[in-house]
Amino acid sequence: MTTQALQDHILFQTGYLVNGIWKTLDTTFDVLNPATGEVIARVAKAGKAETEDAIAAAAKAFPAWRAKTAKERSAILYRWYELIIENKSWLGRLMTTEQGKPLKEAEGEVEYAASFIQWFAEEAKRANGEIIPPIKPGSRILATREPVGVVAAITPWNFPMAMLTRKLGPALAAGCTGVIKPANNTPLSAFALLTLAKQAGVPDGVLNAVAGNTHEISDAIMASREVRKISFTGSTAVGKTLVRNAADTMKKVSMELGGNAPYIVFEDADIDAAVKGAIANKFRNAGQVCVSVNRFYIQETVYDKFVNKLADAVTALKVGNGLEEGVVVGPLIEPSAVNKVREHVEDAVARSATVLAGGKPHPLGGNFWMPTVLGDCHEGMKLAEEETFGPVAACFRFTSEDEVIQRANNTPYGLAAYFYTQNLSRVFRVSQAIESGMIGINECAVSTELGPFGGVKESGLGREGSVLGLEEYLEVKTLHIGGL
Protein backbone atom coordinates (compact mmCIF):
# COMPACT_ATOMS: atom_id res chain seq x y z
CA MET A 1 0.00 0.00 0.00
CA THR A 2 1.44 3.37 -1.03
CA THR A 3 1.45 6.53 1.06
CA GLN A 4 -1.09 7.96 -1.37
CA ALA A 5 -3.38 5.00 -0.76
CA LEU A 6 -3.17 5.64 2.98
CA GLN A 7 -3.96 9.30 2.46
CA ASP A 8 -7.01 8.51 0.35
CA HIS A 9 -8.61 6.36 3.06
CA ILE A 10 -11.60 7.68 5.01
CA LEU A 11 -9.78 7.08 8.31
CA PHE A 12 -6.86 9.33 7.33
CA GLN A 13 -7.55 12.63 9.10
CA THR A 14 -5.26 15.65 9.39
CA GLY A 15 -7.41 18.26 11.12
CA TYR A 16 -8.41 18.76 14.73
CA LEU A 17 -11.64 17.32 16.10
CA VAL A 18 -14.25 19.40 17.90
CA ASN A 19 -17.86 18.38 18.39
CA GLY A 20 -17.69 15.65 15.77
CA ILE A 21 -16.22 17.84 13.02
CA TRP A 22 -12.68 17.64 11.65
CA LYS A 23 -11.54 21.23 11.15
CA THR A 24 -8.57 22.61 9.24
CA LEU A 25 -6.13 25.41 9.97
CA ASP A 26 -3.82 27.46 7.77
CA THR A 27 -0.94 26.63 10.10
CA THR A 28 0.21 23.01 9.98
CA PHE A 29 3.08 20.77 11.08
CA ASP A 30 4.66 17.86 9.23
CA VAL A 31 4.32 14.21 10.20
CA LEU A 32 7.27 12.18 8.91
CA ASN A 33 7.89 8.53 8.15
CA PRO A 34 10.87 7.81 10.45
CA ALA A 35 12.14 5.09 8.12
CA THR A 36 12.31 7.28 5.01
CA GLY A 37 12.02 10.90 6.14
CA GLU A 38 9.05 11.32 3.80
CA VAL A 39 6.36 13.83 4.79
CA ILE A 40 3.22 11.72 5.04
CA ALA A 41 0.85 14.40 6.33
CA ARG A 42 0.51 18.06 7.18
CA VAL A 43 -1.63 18.28 10.30
CA ALA A 44 -3.54 21.26 11.65
CA LYS A 45 -1.39 22.97 14.29
CA ALA A 46 -3.87 23.60 17.07
CA GLY A 47 -3.19 25.93 19.98
CA LYS A 48 -4.95 27.62 22.88
CA ALA A 49 -8.14 28.65 21.07
CA GLU A 50 -8.72 25.24 19.49
CA THR A 51 -8.05 23.49 22.80
CA GLU A 52 -10.53 25.71 24.62
CA ASP A 53 -13.12 24.90 21.95
CA ALA A 54 -12.44 21.19 22.42
CA ILE A 55 -12.81 21.48 26.20
CA ALA A 56 -16.07 23.39 25.80
CA ALA A 57 -17.43 20.71 23.46
CA ALA A 58 -16.51 17.95 25.91
CA ALA A 59 -18.12 19.83 28.80
CA LYS A 60 -21.31 20.38 26.81
CA ALA A 61 -21.51 16.70 25.82
CA PHE A 62 -20.87 15.41 29.34
CA PRO A 63 -24.41 15.54 30.84
CA ALA A 64 -25.98 13.52 28.01
CA TRP A 65 -23.16 10.96 27.91
CA ARG A 66 -23.17 10.36 31.66
CA ALA A 67 -26.96 9.99 31.53
CA LYS A 68 -26.73 7.03 29.16
CA THR A 69 -27.12 3.70 30.86
CA ALA A 70 -24.06 1.56 31.41
CA LYS A 71 -25.52 -0.93 28.97
CA GLU A 72 -25.82 1.74 26.27
CA ARG A 73 -22.24 2.90 26.73
CA SER A 74 -21.09 -0.72 26.76
CA ALA A 75 -22.75 -1.42 23.41
CA ILE A 76 -21.07 1.59 21.79
CA LEU A 77 -17.68 0.58 23.16
CA TYR A 78 -18.09 -2.96 21.93
CA ARG A 79 -18.94 -1.72 18.44
CA TRP A 80 -15.81 0.45 18.52
CA TYR A 81 -13.79 -2.64 19.42
CA GLU A 82 -15.27 -4.53 16.47
CA LEU A 83 -14.47 -1.71 14.03
CA ILE A 84 -10.86 -1.53 15.21
CA ILE A 85 -10.41 -5.25 14.60
CA GLU A 86 -12.13 -5.04 11.21
CA ASN A 87 -9.65 -2.34 10.14
CA LYS A 88 -6.55 -3.97 11.68
CA SER A 89 -4.62 -4.32 8.44
CA TRP A 90 -5.01 -0.68 7.37
CA LEU A 91 -4.44 0.66 10.89
CA GLY A 92 -1.27 -1.40 11.19
CA ARG A 93 0.13 0.02 7.96
CA LEU A 94 -0.72 3.54 9.05
CA MET A 95 1.06 3.02 12.36
CA THR A 96 4.17 1.54 10.77
CA THR A 97 4.29 4.41 8.29
CA GLU A 98 4.17 7.17 10.90
CA GLN A 99 5.81 5.42 13.87
CA GLY A 100 8.28 2.98 12.29
CA LYS A 101 7.69 -0.27 14.17
CA PRO A 102 7.55 -3.47 12.06
CA LEU A 103 4.16 -4.23 10.55
CA LYS A 104 3.66 -7.39 12.60
CA GLU A 105 4.25 -5.40 15.78
CA ALA A 106 1.94 -2.64 14.59
CA GLU A 107 -0.88 -5.08 13.89
CA GLY A 108 -0.22 -6.60 17.30
CA GLU A 109 -0.62 -3.17 18.85
CA VAL A 110 -3.92 -2.67 17.03
CA GLU A 111 -5.20 -5.88 18.64
CA TYR A 112 -3.79 -4.80 21.99
CA ALA A 113 -5.46 -1.40 21.67
CA ALA A 114 -8.76 -3.04 20.83
CA SER A 115 -8.49 -5.30 23.88
CA PHE A 116 -8.85 -2.32 26.21
CA ILE A 117 -12.04 -1.21 24.49
CA GLN A 118 -13.42 -4.74 24.69
CA TRP A 119 -12.47 -5.05 28.38
CA PHE A 120 -13.97 -1.73 29.42
CA ALA A 121 -17.10 -2.38 27.39
CA GLU A 122 -17.73 -5.05 30.02
CA GLU A 123 -16.41 -3.05 32.98
CA ALA A 124 -18.84 -0.23 32.11
CA LYS A 125 -21.56 -2.37 33.67
CA ARG A 126 -19.61 -2.84 36.91
CA ALA A 127 -19.23 0.67 38.36
CA ASN A 128 -20.92 -0.64 41.47
CA GLY A 129 -21.69 1.29 44.63
CA GLU A 130 -22.13 0.14 48.21
CA ILE A 131 -24.83 0.02 50.87
CA ILE A 132 -23.25 0.82 54.22
CA PRO A 133 -24.79 -0.29 57.55
CA PRO A 134 -26.72 2.68 59.02
CA ILE A 135 -25.70 4.30 62.30
CA LYS A 136 -29.28 4.77 63.52
CA PRO A 137 -32.79 3.42 62.83
CA GLY A 138 -34.70 4.83 59.87
CA SER A 139 -31.60 5.77 57.93
CA ARG A 140 -29.43 4.51 55.11
CA ILE A 141 -25.91 5.26 53.88
CA LEU A 142 -25.18 4.72 50.20
CA ALA A 143 -21.90 5.19 48.35
CA THR A 144 -22.29 5.71 44.61
CA ARG A 145 -19.66 6.01 41.90
CA GLU A 146 -20.02 8.76 39.33
CA PRO A 147 -17.91 9.91 36.36
CA VAL A 148 -15.27 12.47 37.24
CA GLY A 149 -16.18 14.69 34.26
CA VAL A 150 -14.09 15.98 31.36
CA VAL A 151 -10.82 14.07 31.01
CA ALA A 152 -7.67 15.15 29.16
CA ALA A 153 -5.68 12.24 27.73
CA ILE A 154 -2.11 13.05 26.67
CA THR A 155 -0.60 10.13 24.78
CA PRO A 156 2.92 9.20 23.57
CA TRP A 157 4.32 8.33 20.15
CA ASN A 158 5.72 4.87 20.95
CA PHE A 159 2.31 3.17 21.31
CA PRO A 160 0.01 5.68 19.60
CA MET A 161 -3.09 3.47 19.57
CA ALA A 162 -2.80 1.33 22.69
CA MET A 163 -2.04 4.25 25.00
CA LEU A 164 -5.08 6.05 23.61
CA THR A 165 -7.52 3.21 24.20
CA ARG A 166 -6.05 2.37 27.60
CA LYS A 167 -7.22 5.83 28.67
CA LEU A 168 -10.38 6.31 26.62
CA GLY A 169 -11.81 2.84 27.28
CA PRO A 170 -12.30 3.42 31.01
CA ALA A 171 -13.11 7.11 30.56
CA LEU A 172 -16.02 6.38 28.22
CA ALA A 173 -17.13 3.38 30.26
CA ALA A 174 -17.33 5.56 33.37
CA GLY A 175 -19.38 8.20 31.58
CA CYS A 176 -16.63 10.79 31.08
CA THR A 177 -16.02 12.89 27.99
CA GLY A 178 -12.58 13.81 26.75
CA VAL A 179 -10.00 15.94 25.02
CA ILE A 180 -7.15 13.98 23.47
CA LYS A 181 -3.69 15.37 22.81
CA PRO A 182 -1.69 12.79 20.81
CA ALA A 183 2.05 13.12 20.28
CA ASN A 184 2.95 15.29 17.31
CA ASN A 185 5.08 12.48 15.85
CA THR A 186 2.09 10.15 15.58
CA PRO A 187 -1.28 11.95 15.55
CA LEU A 188 -2.65 10.03 12.56
CA SER A 189 -3.04 6.76 14.47
CA ALA A 190 -5.06 8.50 17.18
CA PHE A 191 -7.19 10.37 14.66
CA ALA A 192 -8.02 7.15 12.83
CA LEU A 193 -9.25 5.51 16.04
CA LEU A 194 -11.36 8.55 16.89
CA THR A 195 -12.93 8.41 13.43
CA LEU A 196 -13.88 4.79 14.12
CA ALA A 197 -15.28 5.82 17.51
CA LYS A 198 -17.72 8.14 15.77
CA GLN A 199 -18.69 5.36 13.37
CA ALA A 200 -19.34 3.17 16.42
CA GLY A 201 -21.85 5.66 17.78
CA VAL A 202 -19.86 7.83 20.18
CA PRO A 203 -21.86 11.09 20.14
CA ASP A 204 -20.39 14.32 18.82
CA GLY A 205 -18.46 16.24 21.45
CA VAL A 206 -17.80 13.23 23.66
CA LEU A 207 -14.32 12.83 22.17
CA ASN A 208 -12.32 15.78 20.82
CA ALA A 209 -8.69 15.97 19.70
CA VAL A 210 -5.99 18.57 19.19
CA ALA A 211 -2.32 18.33 18.23
CA GLY A 212 0.27 20.96 17.40
CA ASN A 213 1.46 23.64 19.80
CA THR A 214 2.21 21.42 22.78
CA HIS A 215 2.78 24.21 25.31
CA GLU A 216 -0.38 26.12 24.38
CA ILE A 217 -2.48 22.95 24.41
CA SER A 218 -1.08 21.81 27.74
CA ASP A 219 -1.46 25.24 29.35
CA ALA A 220 -5.09 25.50 28.22
CA ILE A 221 -5.88 22.05 29.59
CA MET A 222 -4.21 22.66 32.92
CA ALA A 223 -5.82 26.09 33.39
CA SER A 224 -9.34 24.83 32.68
CA ARG A 225 -11.67 24.19 35.61
CA GLU A 226 -13.84 22.11 33.28
CA VAL A 227 -11.10 19.48 32.94
CA ARG A 228 -11.31 17.36 36.07
CA LYS A 229 -8.72 14.69 35.30
CA ILE A 230 -5.42 14.34 33.46
CA SER A 231 -4.11 11.01 32.20
CA PHE A 232 -0.58 11.25 30.86
CA THR A 233 1.94 8.78 29.48
CA GLY A 234 5.41 10.18 28.90
CA SER A 235 8.59 11.33 30.58
CA THR A 236 8.94 11.78 34.32
CA ALA A 237 10.10 15.38 33.89
CA VAL A 238 6.95 16.37 31.99
CA GLY A 239 4.78 14.33 34.33
CA LYS A 240 6.10 16.19 37.36
CA THR A 241 5.30 19.51 35.70
CA LEU A 242 1.75 18.38 34.95
CA VAL A 243 1.22 17.19 38.53
CA ARG A 244 2.39 20.55 39.87
CA ASN A 245 0.11 22.43 37.48
CA ALA A 246 -2.84 20.15 38.24
CA ALA A 247 -2.70 21.26 41.86
CA ASP A 248 -4.00 24.73 40.95
CA THR A 249 -7.42 23.31 40.09
CA MET A 250 -7.08 20.05 42.05
CA LYS A 251 -7.42 17.80 39.02
CA LYS A 252 -7.20 14.05 39.47
CA VAL A 253 -4.06 12.67 37.83
CA SER A 254 -2.90 9.38 36.37
CA MET A 255 0.76 9.30 35.42
CA GLU A 256 2.60 6.53 33.55
CA LEU A 257 6.15 7.81 33.44
CA GLY A 258 9.73 6.75 32.77
CA GLY A 259 11.54 3.66 33.94
CA ASN A 260 14.97 2.09 34.38
CA ALA A 261 13.97 -1.55 34.27
CA PRO A 262 16.38 -4.20 35.59
CA TYR A 263 16.45 -7.72 34.09
CA ILE A 264 18.13 -10.17 36.45
CA VAL A 265 19.42 -13.54 35.27
CA PHE A 266 20.28 -15.80 38.21
CA GLU A 267 22.66 -18.74 37.84
CA ASP A 268 19.78 -21.21 38.19
CA ALA A 269 17.82 -19.63 35.33
CA ASP A 270 16.92 -21.29 32.06
CA ILE A 271 19.49 -19.35 30.04
CA ASP A 272 17.91 -20.01 26.65
CA ALA A 273 14.55 -18.78 27.93
CA ALA A 274 16.21 -15.72 29.45
CA VAL A 275 17.93 -14.88 26.15
CA LYS A 276 14.69 -15.33 24.22
CA GLY A 277 12.88 -13.08 26.68
CA ALA A 278 15.64 -10.49 26.47
CA ILE A 279 15.37 -10.28 22.69
CA ALA A 280 11.58 -10.00 22.76
CA ASN A 281 11.61 -7.33 25.44
CA LYS A 282 14.63 -5.20 24.59
CA PHE A 283 14.35 -4.98 20.82
CA ARG A 284 10.59 -4.65 20.43
CA ASN A 285 9.83 -1.26 18.87
CA ALA A 286 13.60 -0.73 18.62
CA GLY A 287 13.79 -0.51 22.41
CA GLN A 288 11.38 2.44 22.52
CA VAL A 289 9.13 0.96 25.20
CA CYS A 290 8.54 2.33 28.69
CA VAL A 291 8.82 -1.16 30.21
CA SER A 292 11.82 -2.12 28.08
CA VAL A 293 14.85 -3.44 29.96
CA ASN A 294 17.48 -0.79 30.59
CA ARG A 295 19.92 -2.83 32.73
CA PHE A 296 20.72 -6.54 32.32
CA TYR A 297 22.19 -8.02 35.51
CA ILE A 298 23.70 -11.49 34.96
CA GLN A 299 25.16 -13.62 37.73
CA GLU A 300 28.92 -14.05 37.33
CA THR A 301 28.81 -17.84 36.91
CA VAL A 302 26.54 -17.65 33.84
CA TYR A 303 27.54 -14.21 32.55
CA ASP A 304 29.66 -15.34 29.59
CA LYS A 305 27.13 -17.95 28.49
CA PHE A 306 24.26 -15.45 28.55
CA VAL A 307 25.99 -12.52 26.85
CA ASN A 308 27.49 -14.68 24.10
CA LYS A 309 24.11 -16.20 23.26
CA LEU A 310 22.49 -12.76 23.43
CA ALA A 311 25.08 -11.20 21.13
CA ASP A 312 24.68 -14.00 18.58
CA ALA A 313 20.90 -13.60 18.60
CA VAL A 314 21.07 -9.82 18.31
CA THR A 315 23.46 -9.96 15.37
CA ALA A 316 20.88 -11.99 13.46
CA LEU A 317 18.08 -9.42 13.88
CA LYS A 318 16.97 -7.87 10.58
CA VAL A 319 16.83 -4.07 10.60
CA GLY A 320 14.91 -1.97 8.10
CA ASN A 321 11.71 -0.27 7.05
CA GLY A 322 8.93 -1.86 9.07
CA LEU A 323 6.87 -2.44 5.93
CA GLU A 324 9.52 -4.77 4.48
CA GLU A 325 9.23 -8.53 4.86
CA GLY A 326 11.19 -10.07 7.72
CA VAL A 327 12.16 -6.81 9.45
CA VAL A 328 12.05 -7.10 13.25
CA VAL A 329 13.80 -3.85 14.24
CA GLY A 330 12.67 -0.60 12.69
CA PRO A 331 14.02 2.94 12.97
CA LEU A 332 14.16 5.17 16.00
CA ILE A 333 11.49 7.85 15.97
CA GLU A 334 13.67 10.87 15.14
CA PRO A 335 17.28 12.12 15.02
CA SER A 336 17.29 13.23 18.67
CA ALA A 337 16.58 9.62 19.68
CA VAL A 338 19.55 8.44 17.61
CA ASN A 339 21.74 11.07 19.25
CA LYS A 340 20.77 9.88 22.73
CA VAL A 341 21.59 6.27 21.87
CA ARG A 342 24.92 7.34 20.41
CA GLU A 343 25.69 9.40 23.52
CA HIS A 344 24.93 6.47 25.84
CA VAL A 345 26.97 3.98 23.82
CA GLU A 346 29.97 6.28 23.45
CA ASP A 347 29.90 7.13 27.16
CA ALA A 348 29.77 3.44 28.11
CA VAL A 349 32.64 2.51 25.79
CA ALA A 350 34.71 5.40 27.13
CA ARG A 351 34.14 4.00 30.62
CA SER A 352 35.39 0.50 29.65
CA ALA A 353 32.27 -1.22 28.33
CA THR A 354 32.88 -3.83 25.62
CA VAL A 355 30.92 -3.81 22.36
CA LEU A 356 29.71 -7.38 21.77
CA ALA A 357 27.30 -6.56 18.94
CA GLY A 358 26.42 -3.44 16.96
CA GLY A 359 27.45 -0.31 18.78
CA LYS A 360 27.13 2.14 15.90
CA PRO A 361 24.65 3.67 13.44
CA HIS A 362 23.22 1.20 10.95
CA PRO A 363 24.49 1.36 7.35
CA LEU A 364 20.93 2.29 6.33
CA GLY A 365 21.60 5.70 7.88
CA GLY A 366 18.90 8.10 8.98
CA ASN A 367 17.14 7.02 12.16
CA PHE A 368 18.48 3.45 12.11
CA TRP A 369 20.82 2.12 14.81
CA MET A 370 22.39 -1.31 14.89
CA PRO A 371 20.97 -3.58 17.62
CA THR A 372 23.66 -3.41 20.27
CA VAL A 373 24.97 -5.51 23.15
CA LEU A 374 27.44 -3.94 25.58
CA GLY A 375 29.34 -6.04 28.11
CA ASP A 376 31.09 -5.16 31.37
CA CYS A 377 28.84 -2.20 32.10
CA HIS A 378 28.83 -0.65 35.54
CA GLU A 379 27.14 2.03 37.62
CA GLY A 380 28.23 5.55 36.76
CA MET A 381 27.64 5.12 33.04
CA LYS A 382 24.82 7.21 31.57
CA LEU A 383 22.96 4.10 30.44
CA ALA A 384 22.87 2.87 34.04
CA GLU A 385 21.27 6.07 35.29
CA GLU A 386 19.10 7.21 32.36
CA GLU A 387 16.53 5.49 30.17
CA THR A 388 18.26 4.85 26.84
CA PHE A 389 15.03 4.22 24.89
CA GLY A 390 16.82 2.47 22.08
CA PRO A 391 18.08 -0.96 20.90
CA VAL A 392 20.95 -1.26 23.38
CA ALA A 393 21.34 -4.16 25.82
CA ALA A 394 23.66 -3.06 28.62
CA CYS A 395 25.00 -6.06 30.56
CA PHE A 396 26.24 -5.91 34.16
CA ARG A 397 27.82 -8.66 36.30
CA PHE A 398 26.71 -9.50 39.84
CA THR A 399 27.67 -12.11 42.42
CA SER A 400 24.92 -12.38 45.06
CA GLU A 401 21.16 -12.03 45.39
CA ASP A 402 21.39 -9.30 48.04
CA GLU A 403 23.84 -7.34 45.91
CA VAL A 404 21.72 -7.38 42.77
CA ILE A 405 18.55 -6.40 44.62
CA GLN A 406 20.32 -3.37 46.05
CA ARG A 407 21.67 -2.40 42.63
CA ALA A 408 18.35 -2.98 40.88
CA ASN A 409 16.58 -0.73 43.39
CA ASN A 410 19.25 1.98 43.21
CA THR A 411 17.17 4.24 40.97
CA PRO A 412 14.39 6.79 41.48
CA TYR A 413 12.25 4.79 39.05
CA GLY A 414 10.10 1.73 39.57
CA LEU A 415 7.93 0.92 36.58
CA ALA A 416 8.88 -2.62 35.54
CA ALA A 417 11.44 -5.25 36.52
CA TYR A 418 12.22 -8.79 35.38
CA PHE A 419 14.10 -11.77 36.72
CA TYR A 420 14.72 -15.35 35.66
CA THR A 421 15.15 -18.18 38.17
CA GLN A 422 13.94 -21.74 38.72
CA ASN A 423 14.09 -21.42 42.51
CA LEU A 424 10.59 -21.03 43.95
CA SER A 425 11.81 -19.55 47.23
CA ARG A 426 13.81 -16.96 45.31
CA VAL A 427 10.72 -16.07 43.25
CA PHE A 428 8.94 -14.86 46.37
CA ARG A 429 11.98 -13.27 48.05
CA VAL A 430 13.05 -11.24 45.05
CA SER A 431 9.58 -10.24 43.90
CA GLN A 432 8.90 -8.84 47.37
CA ALA A 433 12.23 -7.01 47.55
CA ILE A 434 12.22 -5.38 44.11
CA GLU A 435 10.76 -1.85 44.14
CA SER A 436 8.63 -1.89 41.02
CA GLY A 437 4.98 -1.65 40.09
CA MET A 438 5.17 -4.64 37.73
CA ILE A 439 7.49 -7.64 37.77
CA GLY A 440 7.99 -10.30 35.12
CA ILE A 441 9.17 -13.59 36.62
CA ASN A 442 10.45 -15.90 33.87
CA GLU A 443 8.29 -13.65 31.69
CA CYS A 444 9.29 -10.76 29.44
CA ALA A 445 5.86 -9.13 28.99
CA VAL A 446 4.02 -7.32 31.77
CA SER A 447 1.26 -5.46 29.94
CA THR A 448 -2.26 -6.77 29.33
CA GLU A 449 -5.74 -5.33 29.64
CA LEU A 450 -6.38 -7.78 32.50
CA GLY A 451 -3.55 -6.71 34.81
CA PRO A 452 -3.01 -3.36 36.59
CA PHE A 453 -0.37 -1.31 34.76
CA GLY A 454 1.63 1.36 36.58
CA GLY A 455 4.73 2.20 38.53
CA VAL A 456 6.01 3.24 41.93
CA LYS A 457 8.46 5.93 43.05
CA GLU A 458 9.00 8.43 40.21
CA SER A 459 7.52 6.13 37.57
CA GLY A 460 3.95 7.18 38.07
CA LEU A 461 0.67 7.51 39.92
CA GLY A 462 -2.40 5.32 39.55
CA ARG A 463 -3.08 2.19 37.52
CA GLU A 464 -4.38 1.59 34.00
CA GLY A 465 -6.20 -1.47 32.69
CA SER A 466 -7.73 -4.22 34.85
CA VAL A 467 -10.63 -3.79 37.27
CA LEU A 468 -8.68 -0.90 38.82
CA GLY A 469 -8.58 1.12 35.61
CA LEU A 470 -12.21 2.20 35.83
CA GLU A 471 -11.75 3.55 39.37
CA GLU A 472 -9.36 6.22 38.05
CA TYR A 473 -12.27 7.86 36.20
CA LEU A 474 -14.86 7.72 38.98
CA GLU A 475 -15.62 9.78 42.07
CA VAL A 476 -17.37 8.42 45.15
CA LYS A 477 -20.49 10.24 46.35
CA THR A 478 -21.92 9.35 49.77
CA LEU A 479 -25.67 9.65 50.43
CA HIS A 480 -26.93 9.89 54.02
CA ILE A 481 -30.69 9.27 54.00
CA GLY A 482 -32.90 9.80 57.03
CA GLY A 483 -36.60 9.74 57.86
CA LEU A 484 -37.20 6.28 56.49
List the predicted regions and their residue ranges:
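Hydrophobic face of amphipathic alpha-helices that form TPR/SEL1-like repeat modules
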Residues: 1-34
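Residue-level signal for inorganic ion chemistry
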Residues: 37, 73, 95, 117, ...
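Glycine-rich loop-to-alpha-helix module at the N-terminal edge of alpha/beta enzyme cores
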Residues: 38-127
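Conserved C-terminal structural/oligomerization subdomain of aldehyde/semialdehyde dehydrogenase
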Residues: 38-42, 227, 264, 318-319, ...
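Short, well-ordered beta-strand elements within core beta-sheets of diverse protein domains
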Residues: 40-46, 61-67, 153, 263-266, ...
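Generic secondary-structure signature for well-ordered alpha-helical cores
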Residues: 60-63, 67, 82-89, 100, ...
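Rossmann-like NAD(P) dinucleotide-binding subdomain of oxidoreductase/dehydrogenase enzymes
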Residues: 129-273, 398
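ALDH superfamily catalytic-core signature
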Residues: 237-378, 441, 483
